[in-house]
Amino acid sequence: NFYLSIVNPAFEELKSELKKHGRTVEVYTERRDFASIIVQFEGEEELDYSIEVMLYPGLAFPRPVVHFTEWASSRRLRVEGLFRTGIQDYDISDITKDEIIEHFLNEYRNLSSQHNKRIDFKS
């Protein structure tokens, strides 16, 4: 199972590292088609990152989704992304734990730098 063998271990590793930096982290992995990790700092949500699997005939396509609150307007935004650029000829069997971690960290760094809350993660 993609979530049990790839996503959940990635999220647990991220949780452990983020807690070292004073973050409160919740990981939700109960569903078979969705998992999320929510990061808070000083009572405010910094990032809600999830992975959904889109099912198409002959393809199970993993899609990272970021939910966050826009700082200036307080609007709740949803951004759907891709794990890889270029021709999207991959499915859940091609995505690794390290790719999930790297994608999460890139999104987290981008958002945290906008709010001047940078964390120096070991890459």
Language model features with spans:
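Intrinsically disordered, low-complexity regulatory segments enriched in Ser/Thr/Pro
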Residues: 38-102
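Generic alpha-helical propensity signal that fires on short helical segments
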Residues: 20, 25, 43-45, 110, ...
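Contiguous, amphipathic alpha-helical segments that mediate oligomerization or scaffolding
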Residues: 1-25
